[in-house]
Amino acid sequence: MDFKDTIQQIVEKIAKQKDSIATEEATKNSFVMPVIAALGYDVFNPFEVVPEMDCDLVKRKGEKIDYAIMKDENPILLIECKHCKQNLNLHDTQLQRYFVASKARFGVLTNGIEYRFYTDLEKVNIMDEKPFLVVNMLDLSDNDIEQLKKFHKSYYNEQDILSTAQELQITIQVKEMLNRNFQMPDDEFTRYFVRNLNDGKYTAKLVDQYRPIVKKSIALVINDIISDRLNVAMKNEN
């Protein structure tokens, strides 16, 4: 079975079981450990996966990461797990502390459904505030699977991942901005169209006038793109 098929099996399992998972430990056993195994690591081999690895800081003792993926006796990926219904926004500072205390270049914060991948692009050994990759197991794209595959034991290459991490991180932020403005164009986004259609001039009144038109126009463009792709697909089938 190839990697994609294995991941799809895990996705089906998550969809069926997510409402029955009562604890964080159950989340780890049912959702997270199968993903680690799918990445080619033996979860019962301490040379590959260390559960509850110490990540102590000078002023904080007893800090432990849920899982550390190992290579050549060094951690390469830290995984901090939460219950599958937990909001991950509440827990990123915890992973930041663990990241500083280790030599790993990558950290993952997950609730077994959403996986947020972090590294230290801005300052060495200081985890970035923004993840460079966010994967939702219940809304998985082919590209998500390809990005996950880069962390597979057989394909893992730290420099290759780092070389694409910044682009991925920026892509996430651009998509978030576009999504916000597609839902409700803000003043700056709307002014772009006002200026370009009025010889560089704009007023608050024009911005308010254009805002619903911009929103409607975006929806029409998206619908046109979808219709064009469907028409092409139908022609290819015929």
Regions found by a protein language model. Give the residues of each.
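A short, conserved, highly charged catalytic patch centered on acidic carboxylates
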Residues: 1-106, 116-238
